[in-house]
């Protein structure tokens, strides 16, 4: 069924940098109270960074605030410790552990709790009192289902690019996106958390040396879906000035719906709540324990996303984009060249898929996520992607290409076109580098997989501390880290990724130019336009011909 969740998780986890040897950490005074953070040092940089962890931006969403819009955090007395990561929002920790192993990571995740609406701030320590630095506001990925702020250490990016990095958490899964479509549970709770966190930045970021008038929202996978959604929401107007979405866009799959009760009934079933009335259903869910929701999540992976509620979202994403009635800000967006290469098919493809597949197996997986609304459409798509396949390995490669295109690449390219045609400056990339640390973990056919770009954006080459990536980066990859931090830092500062010492990144205009991000960067043109044309034009023609026979 269409409601089956594809866990578009973000899988690159982060690391804490080593605390600098100082007697006491930095103190910042906010209107809600004071915070004591810690100084951290960054490999390869002379700058120290102030790190503030677990800052509350909302009241705990528990009791009557469960399945409700978030409320701003309340003031606290005294000096609040800001040196520990907050608990993760409710999720299945077994999934995070499994993903970590696949990604060659070694770290101990924190506990999970409904009381999870916190954010982390990383800011360069050596700055003048009058200096206001641009802000990158990062939203984690994980299919709107898993993940958390602990996965990202913003200190390397903050030090190298002299920017303020904010990493937030938001409610996930059932508690983040459940909706009955009426006044009892309008939904979009996780997106509303993101809006409140942006409002917190507007009110508080100057205390950390940040500029509230220069905020870039950024994210990957579900984080990219989120930043894309925020450009469509009237609630986010004036809260940010540039946007980055990596391997995710608002049009991806069925991430926005006008009919949330289809999914609400599935939730009612796994939580054992009466769905005969929406009032009874929501009342029952507010009485459930945290463990009840974790058990429900383990029982069935439920797709939940944005609901057209008339408040956060006025219409489904595609219709808003077509109308051009959205926030026109500079956009940087892109994909990897093998989005469905390894991590995602490990979950959804049949056993032994990596050795080779047949057409029947391809059709079975595709049918899980794309049930045929028009007879014959899936066969036509499979025909296109397998037309040159001669061996089981060829079929496997066509399968991974097809699923990557349908789930991520084509939606991102379409959204890029909508923003460009509405008058926004757009910069597109394809990340093509296969990280060295996966050379002995992944099969040789896997190229740049989903989320492989994120570590380079955050300077993973220079991570050190309690959370480790098992493997090594080459000297060429160290330079790629610096290059990508440079591009992202420039965009956060100016709305353009270009700057001294970097290969020119062309705008994504009517000529469809983009940048190939490899050890050596090059300009490209017409990314996947042949497949976009097939899916938008040729497929309809073939279906018409099929009906005529």
What are these regions (language model features)?
Residues 2-6, 11-191, 212, 359, ...:
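Non-catalytic accessory segments of hydrolases
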Residues 52, 114-118, 134, 328-329, ...:
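Extracellular structured ligand-interaction cores
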Residues 136, 195-198, 202, 228-231, ...:
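Non-transmembrane alpha-helical segments in soluble domains
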Residues 218-222, 430-438, 503-512:
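Short, solvent-exposed turn/loop segments enriched in Gly/Ser/Thr/Pro and often Arg
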Residues 250, 284-475, 487:
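Substrate-gating cap/lid region and adjacent catalytic-acid/histidine neighborhood
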């Amino acid at each position: 069924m269409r409601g089956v969740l594809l866990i578009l998780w973000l899988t690159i986890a982060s690391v804490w940098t080593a605390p600098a040897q100082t007697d006491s950490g930095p103190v910042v005074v906010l209107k809600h109270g004071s915070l004591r953070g810690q100084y951290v040092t960054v490999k390869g940089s002379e700058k120290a960074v102030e790190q503030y962890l677990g800052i509350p931006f909302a009241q705990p969403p528990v009791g009557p605030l469960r399945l409700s819009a978030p409320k701003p955090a309340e003031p606290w007395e005294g000096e609040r410790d800001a040196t520990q990561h907050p608990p993760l929002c409710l999720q299945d920790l077994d999934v995070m552990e499994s993903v970590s192993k696949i990604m060659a990571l070694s770290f101990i995740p924190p506990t999970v709790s409904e009381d999870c609406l916190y954010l982390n701030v990383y800011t360069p320590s050596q700055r003048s009192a009058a200096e206001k630095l641009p802000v990158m506001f990062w939203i984690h990925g994980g299919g709107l289902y898993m993940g958390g702020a602990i996965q990202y250490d913003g200190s390397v990016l903050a030090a190298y690019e002299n920017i303020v990095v904010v990493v937030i958490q938001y409610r996930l899964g059932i508690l983040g996106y459940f909706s009955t479509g009426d006044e009892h549970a309008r939904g979009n709770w996780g997106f509303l958390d993101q809006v409140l966190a942006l409002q917190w930045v507007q009110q508080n970021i100057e205390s950390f040396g940040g500029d509230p008038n220069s905020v870039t929202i950024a994210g990957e996978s579900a984080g990219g879906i989120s930043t894309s959604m925020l450009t469509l929401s009237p609630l986010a107007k004036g809260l940010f000035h540039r946007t980055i979405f990596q391997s995710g866009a608002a049009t991806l799959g069925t991430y926005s719906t006008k009919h949330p009760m289809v999914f609400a009934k599935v939730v009612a079933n796994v939580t054992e709540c009466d769905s005969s009335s929406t009032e009874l259903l929501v009342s029952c869910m507010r009485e459930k324990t945290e463990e009840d929701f974790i058990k429900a999540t383990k029982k069935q992976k439920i797709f939940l996303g944005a609901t057209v509620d008339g408040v956060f979202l006025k219409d489904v994403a595609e219709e808003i984009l077509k109308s051009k009635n959205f926030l026109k800000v500079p956009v940087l967006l892109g994909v990897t060249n093998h989005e469905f290469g390894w991590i995602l098919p490990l979950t959804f493809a049949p056993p032994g898929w990596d050795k080779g597949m047949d057409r029947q197996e391809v059709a079975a997986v595709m049918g899980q996520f794309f049930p045929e609304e028009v007879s014959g459409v899936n066969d036509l798509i499979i025909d296109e992607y397998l037309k040159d396949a001669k061996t089981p390995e060829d079929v496997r490669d066509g399968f991974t290409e097809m699923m990557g295109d349908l789930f991520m690449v084509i939606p991102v390219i379409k959204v890029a076109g909508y923003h460009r045609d509405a008058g926004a400056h757009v910069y597109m990339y394809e990340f093509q580098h296969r990280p060295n640390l996966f050379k002995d973990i992944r099969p040789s056919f896997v190229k740049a997989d989903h989320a492989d770009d994120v570590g380079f954006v955050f300077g993973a080459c220079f991570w050190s501390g309690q959370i480790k990536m098992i493997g090594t980066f080459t000297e060429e990859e160290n330079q790629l880290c610096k290059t990508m931090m440079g591009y992202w830092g420039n965009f956060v500062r100016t709305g353009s990724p270009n700057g001294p010492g970097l290969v020119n990144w062309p705008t994504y205009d009517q000529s469809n130019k983009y940048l190939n991000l490899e050890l050596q960067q090059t300009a490209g043109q017409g990314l996947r336009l042949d497949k976009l044309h097939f899916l938008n034009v040729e497929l309809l023609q073939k279906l018409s011909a099929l009906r005529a026979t």
